[in-house]
């Protein structure tokens, strides 16, 4: 026991670990025959915290295989199997390249990705889900808001600032993150010939993005401050950031047809151009070549920095119904969870799900339109439900989706009556 006298008859207590007296520390904690000071407790906490952090980093270091990545994507994204396979391999190779620096002197190039597919086909969700499984920072940018430096609009380096914000300005983490740039087709060059006038939101932005995507050291103001000459900038190397660009590329199928069907002229060519079902468009996009993207309006250097290109198919009715019900975070499950918090069960009948999918197809918004349709259907019920008592179940059928009737509310007393009636 760490005790001793101080000459006045009072016993002075000492820490059993560092030997400091009770007068030298803020707090001395007593245990069975031992004492420990606040400084030693803090030191022990630091040691445990450091060891836990190292163990956590070792666990995180394991890179999932392409199959594991694809299986994880299956839990959140419906369909698009070919795109999932392409993405899984590209992402696996990218992070394997970072983990194992080449020992034989072979420099491995970065495989940035271009996703081509209609609105609501799952481009953004695929990129977000990839970042989740790999546990890396993820930032999104809209290409339509970007302009060249010096013009009114968003500077391309703001993309890196968004990435830094997602990881609390940890530069090392940000340098291994994923950036998704949406609406990339909207910055295509306005014509085949380079214009003598400035194309502030077209070719100029492609040139600015080109440096960022291929790898440069971007100067970013710390903690979201504005740039000014006296400020210290954070230096972020973008060489190892994975860039995924996405866009609908409306009319790209026509560019491909023009190239592949040059032999078809006259009446037969007109017939072919009118025939544009979803399946046929998907087949045509499957024949995509780099020259088609250049013809569409992307500059050759930009196309060259996006070596992995994959297309996503437009979602049909069956896929939209699956999206409503199957994924871990399916929309119907989300709303059912909200209603459960109010003590009510939410039921969607099969014909209601079909009607919702048909509405989304009519709006040509793909999966993106599903939430707004559901919000609209359930708005009045979500407004009234917290004020109502004894609502056990809310039922949505086809007539509710089509606006012909209101959701069916089943009260607790109604269920009791039906239960007692069945007993009689």
Swiss-Prot record:
<keyword id="KW-0547">Nucleotide-binding</keyword>
<dbReference type="InterPro" id="IPR046425">
    <property type="entry name" value="ClpX_bact"/>
</dbReference>
<keyword id="KW-0479">Metal-binding</keyword>
<comment type="subunit">
    <text>Component of the ClpX-ClpP complex. Forms a hexameric ring that, in the presence of ATP, binds to fourteen ClpP subunits assembled into a disk-like structure with a central cavity, resembling the structure of eukaryotic proteasomes.</text>
</comment>
<keyword id="KW-0862">Zinc</keyword>
<dbReference type="GO" id="GO:0051603">
    <property type="term" value="P:proteolysis involved in protein catabolic process"/>
</dbReference>
<dbReference type="InterPro" id="IPR019489">
    <property type="entry name" value="Clp_ATPase_C"/>
</dbReference>
<dbReference type="GO" id="GO:0005524">
    <property type="term" value="F:ATP binding"/>
</dbReference>
<dbReference type="GO" id="GO:0046983">
    <property type="term" value="F:protein dimerization activity"/>
</dbReference>
<dbReference type="GO" id="GO:0016887">
    <property type="term" value="F:ATP hydrolysis activity"/>
</dbReference>
<feature type="domain" description="ClpX-type ZB">
    <location>
        <begin position="1"/>
        <end position="56"/>
    </location>
</feature>
<dbReference type="InterPro" id="IPR038366">
    <property type="entry name" value="Znf_CppX_C4_sf"/>
</dbReference>
<dbReference type="Pfam" id="PF07724">
    <property type="entry name" value="AAA_2"/>
</dbReference>
<comment type="similarity">
    <text>Belongs to the ClpX chaperone family.</text>
</comment>
<dbReference type="Pfam" id="PF10431">
    <property type="entry name" value="ClpB_D2-small"/>
</dbReference>
<feature type="binding site">
    <location>
        <position position="15"/>
    </location>
    <ligand>
        <name>Zn(2+)</name>
    </ligand>
</feature>
<dbReference type="GO" id="GO:0140662">
    <property type="term" value="F:ATP-dependent protein folding chaperone"/>
</dbReference>
<keyword id="KW-0143">Chaperone</keyword>
<feature type="binding site">
    <location>
        <position position="40"/>
    </location>
    <ligand>
        <name>Zn(2+)</name>
    </ligand>
</feature>
<dbReference type="InterPro" id="IPR003959">
    <property type="entry name" value="ATPase_AAA_core"/>
</dbReference>
<dbReference type="GO" id="GO:0009376">
    <property type="term" value="C:HslUV protease complex"/>
</dbReference>
<dbReference type="InterPro" id="IPR010603">
    <property type="entry name" value="Znf_CppX_C4"/>
</dbReference>
<feature type="binding site">
    <location>
        <begin position="118"/>
        <end position="125"/>
    </location>
    <ligand>
        <name>ATP</name>
    </ligand>
</feature>
<dbReference type="InterPro" id="IPR027417">
    <property type="entry name" value="P-loop_NTPase"/>
</dbReference>
<feature type="binding site">
    <location>
        <position position="18"/>
    </location>
    <ligand>
        <name>Zn(2+)</name>
    </ligand>
</feature>
<comment type="function">
    <text>ATP-dependent specificity component of the Clp protease. It directs the protease to specific substrates. Can perform chaperone functions in the absence of ClpP.</text>
</comment>
<dbReference type="GO" id="GO:0051082">
    <property type="term" value="F:unfolded protein binding"/>
</dbReference>
<protein>
    <recommendedName>
        <fullName>ATP-dependent Clp protease ATP-binding subunit ClpX</fullName>
    </recommendedName>
</protein>
<feature type="binding site">
    <location>
        <position position="37"/>
    </location>
    <ligand>
        <name>Zn(2+)</name>
    </ligand>
</feature>
<dbReference type="InterPro" id="IPR050052">
    <property type="entry name" value="ATP-dep_Clp_protease_ClpX"/>
</dbReference>
<dbReference type="Pfam" id="PF06689">
    <property type="entry name" value="zf-C4_ClpX"/>
</dbReference>
<keyword id="KW-0067">ATP-binding</keyword>
<dbReference type="InterPro" id="IPR004487">
    <property type="entry name" value="Clp_protease_ATP-bd_su_ClpX"/>
</dbReference>
<dbReference type="GO" id="GO:0051301">
    <property type="term" value="P:cell division"/>
</dbReference>
<dbReference type="InterPro" id="IPR003593">
    <property type="entry name" value="AAA+_ATPase"/>
</dbReference>
<dbReference type="GO" id="GO:0008270">
    <property type="term" value="F:zinc ion binding"/>
</dbReference>
